[in-house]
Structures are given as C-alpha cells and as structure tokens.
C-alpha cells in the first residue's frame, strides 16, 4: 500500500501542481496551487483517487454530499464504488426549476459524508454543513483529496465535523521531493 500511495501522490502532484500567484477561495494568496480539475478530468487518475478514498468512508454514513463544483465528480464516482447515494450541494439555491440547494433527493434524516476536492480553511465545508443541517441532514464527517494544511481540520472540528484528507500538502510535496508520502492511516 505504501508504494501505491507514493505513486498516487506523485501522480496527483505532477498532474495538478502549479506555481505562480493564486488567490484562494479563502482570500489568501498562494505561490502554488493544486488545480483539482486536472486530476478530476483524468478518468484513470480520478478512479485511482476514488479507490483510495473508499476505505476512508466512515461507517454509518448513508449518503455522500458532493460540494459544488469539485466535490461533485468525486461524490459521483465514490457513489458508484460504494453504492451510497450521492447528493450535490450548491453554494446557493437555484433561482429557477426546483430552486433547491441540494440535488439528488431529500437529505432530511440522512447521515451524510461531505466530499470536497481541496481544502485550505474548510470555509465551504462549514457553510455547506450548516446548509445541510438546516435541511435536516446529520453531518459529522468530511473527506477531501488534498488538505492544504491551512487550518481546515481545526475549523471543521469546531463545527463538529471530522475532516480526513487522502493527502496533505506536505505529503504531496514529499512525493515530489523525496519520492515518498508518509502513510498516516
């Protein structure tokens, strides 16, 4: 597993790591960026990422809540792998049609795993968790591919959400720099 994990980390890094000047969702500026659309649009890489996420799905959840936009392909493929239904959470309700915040069915009474792509401060996880809870869902867990280590784990915990990442920024950088990504699991 360690070698497979190292290889996957290196693939994610080489596919999606960019350098330059980037403004993050949190408003922070960074000199590097993980372009999640690069790994989410590669079917083989996305499949391997999701296969690595499957064992991280906590027991007791009965639905996956993919956050707009990057969490949607992850939740869709994770749904196909686990058999759990997927729900798609908008940043704000549509202003036409069903005018729903959450698509895919009623989440009232469901125990949902929030699925996100890249997390820095967990701001969107917190907002979406609050929205899902207002719709009657129970949310105690979130899962992401990359934790940029910007305090998101602590912010999510303060909201009562345990956030797990497939990789931290440090692990991805280690896969590039030292050819290894430590296995935290």
Q: What are these model-derived regions, one by one?
A:
Residues 60-70, 143-144:
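Short glycine-rich phosphate-binding loop at a beta-alpha junction
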Residues 2-11, 131-185:
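PRPP-dependent phosphoribosyltransferase catalytic core
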